[in-house]
Amino acid sequence: MRHSVVLDFKKCRGCTTCIKNCPTEAIRVRSGKATILPNRCIDCGTCIRVCPHKAVKSVCDDFSALKNYRYTIAIPDPALYGQFQNLDDVDIVLNGLLELGFDHVYEASAACEMLSGFARERILKESDRPMPEISPACPAVVRLISIRFPKLINHIAPVITPSEFAAITARQQAVKDTGLSPDEI
């Protein structure tokens, strides 16, 4: 598994702030520098937020990778809107994504609504599932459960995440609308 959290050893001072705040105890200090234990890290980003030396950062794909596709779709999570103070109109964010160069914006919230309806029907039909069910929507929570609370693994709903569903739905619609192959989207 490729992790999204990495350490810059040149910036690390071995202060242990990240260690004290890691919910899964995935960080150790070795030779005066922090080291992330990949089998315990859940990629929650707590260490990124608390490091006073900015030695922990998140790895993400380069924006230029979008140029490999003929048609690009942004799929903003509903949590994105909460990052802006006094946001009265989500269209401001959606239009901003288009201005960044995306060809289309598909709101993940639409997929969330469709998926929650499906999940509700499934829960009613499958009464033998352990309750309460836990949404698989947050990968950090799923990894936290698998590391710290393995007895709850069978409580994770056996459905794809809203983000995955949104990506599938958006791509299928774009194929219909544009005539492009799925590989081009």
What does each of the following model-derived ranges do?
Residues C60-I185:
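Iron-sulfur-associated redox domains of electron-transfer enzymes in respiratory
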Residues R2-I42, T46-D61:
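Iron-sulfur cluster-binding cysteine motifs and their immediate structural context
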